[in-house]
Amino acid sequence: MSGRVRPIVVLVGPPGSGKTTIGRRLANALNTSVVDSDVLIEQLQGKPCGVVFAELGEPNFRDLEAEVIDFALTTAGVVSLGGGAVTTESVRQKLRAQIVVWVDVSAAEGVRRTAVENSRPLLDTTNPLERYSELLAQRRDFYKEVADYRAHTDGRSPQQIVADILGFLETLR
């Protein structure tokens, strides 16, 4: 067995699915740390992730994100990835060696949760529900490809979701 450090679990899913909240609570339950790729990008660039995305454009942002994820995947604990990270092939390849949970949400609920923020350039449109639905359609197969477990979040408390993920992780021991 390799002595290499790796995450306990990696969370993927669309914006507003609850990855950040679930990641913090899951890390707390596992008595470990949480690393969020969006937060790492913000720290590296010194500005909000949405601003970095808008300034760099999606292709350059995804390249930066992939580099940050390379680092994040060398840390122990829980790792939470940005919603579009799975669109990058090199990221999906690296996730094959990880335990990945897809934190899933419906388009309507995802839009409701992200409506209070103005930090999501891909959702800055006159019809956020339509755009969110398009993003889900574009990314769904990528989430399925990398996920070992799917946690539905609509109508469920963070505590319930964390309990489900902990139950899944227990089956791997």
UniProtKB/Swiss-Prot annotation:
Substrate binds at residues 38, 62, 83, 139. It catalyses: shikimate + ATP = 3-phosphoshikimate + ADP + H(+). This is Shikimate kinase. Monomer. Signal peptide: none annotated. It is found in: Cytoplasm. It comes from the Bacteria. Belongs to the shikimate kinase family. HAMAP family: Shikimate_kinase. One of its GO terms (biological process) is chorismate biosynthetic process. The lineage of its organism: Bacteria, Bacillati, Actinomycetota, Actinomycetes, Mycobacteriales. GO terms for cellular component: cytosol. ATP binds at residues 16-21, 120, 156.
